[in-house]
């Protein structure tokens, strides 16, 4: 597949890196020559220096042969024009654009992105994707990550093992014996900034970030097994009333108006606008790092503090101050991957990365054949894959023990109609089974090849 990526920032660079690992033909356009030089030196992709919306530049990048264009520059207008040019002049089949400005995606202008107007097939809003990730963590306290699979029948959950975890220093093979009624598969352990694809002899230690598959009915009990019995927060304070904060407020209010919400916002105009938009919410003007402001927010009675400003350092520091001041749980936004491996050690309960959220969402729409879900976890170090077995697949009637899986791939669960099956070597694969796996980064293309050989976008 030939893919043109417009913009070599954190998101564009990550998408390019992923697609190159999966043996795609990748061309990246950016007007920063030094970034393109770095890209050419570090990965097997072709870099083109120039403005992504320029027809000559797109032509030089091979747009007339491209299967897909992903426009993720820092400017919404450039992303939109790049997709329009790719469609009108080069007939690129699929177009994805990152759009930050919420007015563009307002329901009021819902017909803007259509074949008759701006022919963009998928709009990605990083702020909305981040808000969704945070909201998922709020709905299921104790999680650092939560991915829904097989129409909410199965979940991949990440959680930090507390010192109250009843299975500390226990080999994984002992867990089904100790908890026979909880269907669960541990697929990854993050420890000391390294990830481990575990064997049944590996043990769990306090501070480990555990990633596991379980079904919807047993998710809460599984989290209890790892030391988490928190209830859903009823008192929440959000620091940052920008696009992420506003999207999060809207999600919380639309699902449960009984939750007591407070918002801390330093910018006067933004605080006034929030007060007008959400008159029922207490808006405090000031810094979340100011202990007086935190006292005014009654931080001791706040169950969850969420820092979502555009400054990583402020988010992390404010989260730590909030926790020290008596808040039960803190969630921080961190744009830089340099912080994501440190925050848990510092005491931040969950860290959400806009880059990871955006890349995962985009990769959902760059898939092949019977791959239903493909999401990155742990800053792209591993992937969660849900694949459907077609009726004509060579996998039909094959037992799991006969599957030639790549290294560092773990089968999590199999969904067959309404039944959820734990992986057993003797299980025989049937048509339309959904097989859910975890794979180290770079193995997804091999998994895709197992299920299909046809290219399918969207």
Language model segments and positions:
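Cytosolic regulatory regions of ion transport systems
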Residues: 1-458
